[in-house]
Amino acid sequence: MKKKILVFLLVLVMAASMFAGCGASESSSNELTLWMAPMASSDAAVTDEEFWTEVANAFGAANDCTVKVEIIPWDSYEEKYLTGVTSSDGPDIGWLYMEMFYDYIEMGALADLDAYFSDEEKAGYLYYDLGNIQGGQYALPFVVGNPRVMLANMDILAQAGVDAVPTTWDELTAACDAVLANCPGVTALVQDWGNPHYGSLNEIYWPYFWSAGGEIVDDEGSLTINSPEGLEATQFLYDMAQKGYLGTNATACDDVKVPFTNGEAAFAFMASGNALQVEGINWEYVTALQGPQDAETFVAADSLVMFESCENKELAAKLIKHMTSTETMTKYHQTITDQPPITVDEAYTGSEKFAALFTDDADMLRSLPVFKGASSLYDALYKSIQSMMLGELTPEEVLSKTTDYYNSNLK
């Protein structure tokens, strides 16, 4: 029902825009509204708002325009976009992650960017082609990175008699057994099943799912999580919880970085950018664990988009180019978030500890697919696995009930 309401509202706003003009920007063709995601750490010297306001003010001064910046909190991110777009009070330029694209493209809410970039400009972006989604250049990849990796507290492993970071599922379970046997009070593997947002699946579910050989959808866009491979991954997580590897209450944690940084856990999957904020712990990492079929993990592929309601698309495209210039991106990656370059001219300035992620281990990195009802499907799956962790569902029920829900309500 939620999905049907979303589609209906988007239809209404697209129809209304034919008569009402350009929504949030209609007051002036020299005004742009920019919505960005929060990426700076909570204790950062420069906030996201401060950074992008400075960029926007410089652009405005050079182009005789005004750019209004708003940072959208993650906990209300999708709702904010939905409300803004359907009420003609959304941005001219926004930041979408893959789960959000299908419906906005399907209903004509996003502008095709291709005509605003010359061939020379396109060649300056490392991942320009990844922005071609559902037959149009609706995105300009902006954050292609932040892989989810497994961190290991090497001092805890030494106490447990484990001399190397596990690289396979079997090695992980053996190491967890050793931690439980030799390190009282330590959680072997901390997972944030208490986090309210399904984005945690990127760290604590999809790496196992893909490494078991699972596929979220097939080439026709049909949901395929209820497969032998999907069950093997879900059963593996369930078994780890049952063995006590995840602590006494797997749904109590909502941020794995806290217990890991406090030395309370031997292992934790987290974004590479968050890992660099872990101080005071002797940690090493593995990019992905070898499962029954493969070794794969999640990598972000978030993008900048221009909304069709924007009145001055030429100006908006110019702002996007300014935001993604080598100069701006270098400063952004050094000041706000440690990510790999998105342009050919930007040098990698991130931690050498993770330099191999995008070279030697690049074939292990995988993004989420774009398909109908993705966000709602992920939310339903996440809640089902939370119920499994509470003993309310079996692994088989998680996959079957989620698939039935998707096919009945979202497909």
Enumerate the language-model features and the residues they cover:
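Conserved N-terminal structural module of periplasmic/extracytoplasmic solute-binding proteins
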Residues: 22-102, 164, 292-293, 314-315, ...
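Extracytoplasmic "Venus flytrap"/periplasmic binding protein-like
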Residues: 61-125, 132, 155-167, 257-259, ...
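Hinge/lid segment of periplasmic solute-binding proteins
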Residues: 98-148, 173, 183, 201, ...
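Short, solvent-exposed loop/beta-turn-alpha elements that line the ligand-binding surface or hinge
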Residues: 111-125, 129, 188-199, 212-232, ...
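Extracytoplasmic/periplasmic solute-binding protein
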Residues: 136-142, 148, 171-222, 265
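Conserved C-terminal helix/tail region of periplasmic/extracytoplasmic solute-binding proteins
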Residues: 158, 181, 239-242, 362-411
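Glycine-centered hinge/linker elements that transmit conformational signals in sensory
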Residues: 175-178, 220-250
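C-terminal lobe and pocket-closing loops
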Residues: 272-282, 291-383
